[in-house]
Amino acid sequence: ASGPVRRRFGLDDDDLATMTRWVSDSGIRWGYDQAGRAPFALDVEPQGTWRFGLDRLLVGVTVSADGPLQVGGVMPLDDVGSGSVDLVGRVSELLARIGEGLDRLEHAGPATEWMDALTETVLSLTDVPPRERWQVGDLQRTLGSAARHASDEVPLRLADVRVLLADQLAGRPSRASFRTGGLTVCTMTPMRSVP
């Protein structure tokens, strides 16, 4: 998980290791839920989705070791003790916000709606320290610029938004400051003519 996501949900290295184990143990493979698999005609069974894995995790943390083998057709995930309630709650919140973001990005709409949805999704999933808040403003300016370059009369799909944002999010070239007395770290290609 990136730093801003870790900060938003209070995740440390031990939490990430535990989450990785849970993902493996619960059989999560791909797809947020059955609806996310529908375009691939694989929405018959929920097993292997993030939603089903989360259900197993939630049942595992709430049912004791000698409890029922299934609750509502869901087998509890083993080795999820009551001491993990806080982490399970944070994982549940993270996945709920991802699900909300996916819902926002599912429908065609004007560019301004897309940029608002992207901003809301990013802000709900991330938190940056005060000295790095400029990144939030930079994101909003970049998305605003992209929205101004598109017509609000034409509904856009996700693929259209990707194309619209490709140039906006591409890296910006900077002027090289070779031989200015400072330390220059680069690949050999820019310095190939220097003896």
Describe the predicted segments one by one.
Residues 1-195:
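Polyanion-engaging groove/track-forming segments
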